[in-house]
Every structure is written in structure tokens, then in C-alpha cells.
Amino acid sequence: MSLKILFMGTPIFAVPILKSLYNSKHKILEVYTQPAKKKDRGQKVSFSPIHKYSNEINIPVRNPVKLDTEEELRHIKKLKPDVAIVVAYGKILPTQILNLEKIIFINVHASLLPKWRGAAPIQRAIMNCDNETGVSIMKIVPKLDAGPVLIQSKIKIYADTNFEKLSNQMSEVGSKLIL
């Protein structure tokens, strides 16, 4: 069965997961990502990795500053997605969006939940010298990273593991688990 997907993500970690979904039988309706930010001395506008990739594959992009508005609620209702997949979006979804009927909200989280709930789970696993971490696919509920875990995959952490290497590995695992 082909699903209509609303994708919500921002950093490079989310790109392989969006690619995997885009190359599947499912249809990406639209992508939500963080608004562009001004960077460096010249204050040049910089778009998120997800925004850039979405433009490459011609998927409409939306980057609201706030999600808890009537406009965003109406917009998401109008899209009629079957599922919203959230990957390091950087915004907490408001309850009124999570309560929309007929939409399942799924999160791809870079830890073996419940360990390292919240932001920076990869960094926290490395800083705490964990021997393993992993990726969790979970149903989103109003409390942060507290919904039921649907599937997990473990990943070993070695002494020479750094953030970039582990993040890339976890993103690839997430891109397979989400299907």
C-alpha cells in the first residue's frame, strides 16, 4: 500500500531517510523544515540540508516559524497525509496537530529509547562512553519522545567513533527501518 507522507526534518541526518522514502512506493506530499538562517559574517541566507534536497527532487517545502497557528493546522488538514514522519525537525509538534484525525505521527530518533530522550542523543551517547546506541522508530505522543517504540536497531560504538561517523551510520539505519 502506498502512503501519502508529510515529512518534517532539518539536518543532514534526515536526508538519507527522506531519500529512502522518496525512492519508495510512497508519495511525499510536502516537506516541513526549519526556516532559512543568516550565517557567517556576510549574513548570507543558508537553507537546511532537507530544504536543499527537497528542492533537488521538486518536493514542495514549507518552513513556518510557528506551528501552533490556525493556518498551519488548516494546511496540514488540507494535505490529508496518511502519516507524518519526523526526523530531527527541531520543533515540538503542538497537541492540536498531533490530534488531527487520520494522521499517524512517527518519529525517527537517534537513540535506543527511552535512553537519551530529547535533543542531542548522538552526542550524549558518545560523551557518556556508551558501548552501543541505535535508532528507534516510535509513535509520537504529546510528551517528548515518550510514545510507543515500534522498532529499534542497535549500533556498536567503538573507541574511535566520532559524531559524524556515528550520525551517518545511524541515518542509514533509520533510512532502512522507516520502510
Q: Which positions does each model-derived feature cover?
A:
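N-terminal Rossmann-like dinucleotide-binding module
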Residues: 1-41
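Donor/substrate-binding cores of folate-linked one-carbon enzymes
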Residues: 3, 24, 34, 83-179
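Short beta->alpha connector loops
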Residues: 10-13, 65-68, 89-92
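Amphipathic, non-transmembrane alpha-helical secondary structure
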Residues: 15, 19-23, 74-77, 95, ...
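Residues that form or flank phosphate/diphosphate-binding pockets in enzymes
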Residues: 16, 71, 117
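Conserved beta-strand segments of alpha/beta enzyme cores
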Residues: 27, 58-60, 104
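N-terminal glycine-/serine-/threonine-rich beta1-alpha1-beta2 phosphate-ribose binding loop
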Residues: 38-80
